[in-house]
C-alpha cells in the first residue's frame, strides 16, 4: 500500500505544499502568494489536496517547515527547521549538491550539504538587502513588474553600481540614478549585482563547494543567478521546483517518519 506524505513550507511571502508518494514521486503541488499570518497556508493545503484528489486523512504524515511553521500546530504532525528541509529537498533533485543558496522573500540562507544533511550554514534574516523583498522595493521604484526584472536587466550595456547593501540607501541610489537619466535596464543589472554581492558575503563564510544550487522564489530571476555565478566563479543550477524546495524536503522528512 502506498504511503502519501504532505510537506508544507510557510514562508514570509508565500505558502507552498507538496504531496509525495512513497518518498519518490511528486503527486501534486500548490503555491499561494501569501505567507504566514494570512489565509495562505490553509488555502495552499486545500489546493494541493484538491489537485491530488485526496483528503487530509489520506496523508500518513504531515510536516511543516518555514518561517511560519509553528502556526500549523494541530494541522501538521511535526515542525522542522527550513534549513534541514532545504538540504533534504535539494539533495532529492540534485544528488550531488554540496551548497544550497536559498533566497526567499525576507531572508537569505547559504547551506552546506553532505549526503542530504545540513552540516553548516549562514543566514541573513535581519535585513531585507539581498532578499526578494529588496527586489520588490526596487521594482516598485522603477515602475516595472518584479517578474520582468531578469529580462530587462539582460539588455543592459552599461555597468551601473548600486553599492549600498541597505535597502533604504539603495533606494536613494536608484532614485538618484533615475534623476540623472540613467537607463532603467542598466540600473536593474546593477540591482542584480547588489543582491548577489550581499549573498556572496554569506557564501564565502560557509565556503562554496560544487555542485551549487539555487532555491527560493528569487531563483527564477536569472539576472541575480548570473551575477552570483560571475561573483562566485561557479555554475549555479536551479529547477522549476526551486520555490517548492522547502516543501519537498518537508514531505521527504514526513515520509521518513511515516515509513518507520
From Swiss-Prot:
Positions that bind ATP: 12-16, 220, 243
Catalysed conversion reaction: ATP + H2O = ADP + phosphate + H(+)
Record gene name: hgdC
InterPro entries hit by this protein: ATPase_BadF, ATPase_NBD, CoA_E_activase_dom, Dehydratase_Activator_Redct
Gene3D superfamilies assigned to the protein according to its UniProt record, in alphabetical order: 3.30.420.40
Species classification: Bacteria, Bacillati, Bacillota, Negativicutes, Acidaminococcales
Organism (species): Acidaminococcus fermentans (strain ATCC 25085 / DSM 20731 / CCUG 9996 / CIP 106432 / VR4)
Annotated protein name in UniProt: (R)-2-hydroxyglutaryl-CoA dehydratase activating ATPase
Regulation: Inactivated by exposure to air within less than 15 minutes.
Keywords for the protein's UniProt record, in alphabetical order: 4Fe-4S, ATP-binding, Hydrolase, Iron, Iron-sulfur, Magnesium, Metal-binding, Nucleotide-binding
Amino acid at each position: 500500500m502506498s504511503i502519501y506524505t504532505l510537506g508544507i513550507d510557510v514562508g514570509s511571502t508565500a505558502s507552498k505544499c507538496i504531496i509525495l508518494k512513497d518518498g519518490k514521486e511528486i503527486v501534486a503541488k500548490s503555491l499561494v502568494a501569501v505567507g504566514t499570518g494570512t489565509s495562505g497556508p490553509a488555502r495552499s493545503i486545500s489546493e494541493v489536496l484538491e489537485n491530488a484528489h485526496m483528503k487530509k486523512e489520506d496523508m500518513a504524515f504531515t510536516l511543516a517547515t518555514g518561517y511560519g511553521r509553528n502556526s500549523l500546530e494541530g494541522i501538521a504532525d511535526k515542525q522542522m527547521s527550513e534549513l534541514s528541509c532545504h538540504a533534504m529537498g535539494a539533495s532529492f533533485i540534485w544528488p550531488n549538491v554540496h551548497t544550497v543558496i536559498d533566497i526567499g522573500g525576507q531572508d537569505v540562507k547559504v547551506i552546506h550539504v553532505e549526503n542530504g544533511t545540513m552540516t553548516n550554514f549562514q543566514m541573513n534574516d535581519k535585513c531585507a538587502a539581498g532578499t526578494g523583498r529588496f527586489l520588490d522595493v526596487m521594482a516598485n521604484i522603477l515602475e516595472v513588474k518584479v517578474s520582468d526584472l531578469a529580462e530587462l536587466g539582460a539588455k543592459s550595456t552599461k555597468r551601473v553600481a548600486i553599492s549600498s547593501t541597505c535597502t533604504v540607501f539603495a533606494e536613494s541610489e536608484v532614485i538618484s540614478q533615475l534623476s540623472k537619466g540613467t537607463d532603467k535596464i542598466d540600473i536593474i543589472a546593477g540591482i542584480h549585482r547588489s543582491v548577489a554581492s550581499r549573498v556572496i558575503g554569506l557564501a564565502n563564510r560557509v565556503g562554496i563547494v560544487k555542485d551549487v544550487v539555487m532555491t527560493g522564489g528569487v531563483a527564477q530571476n536569472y539576472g541575480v543567478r548570473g551575477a552570483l555565478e560571475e561573483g562566485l566563479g561557479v555554475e549555479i543550477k536551479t529547477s522549476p521546483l526551486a520555490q517548492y524546495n522547502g516543501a519537498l524536503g518537508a514531505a521527504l522528512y514526513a515520509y521518513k517518519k511515516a515509513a518507520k
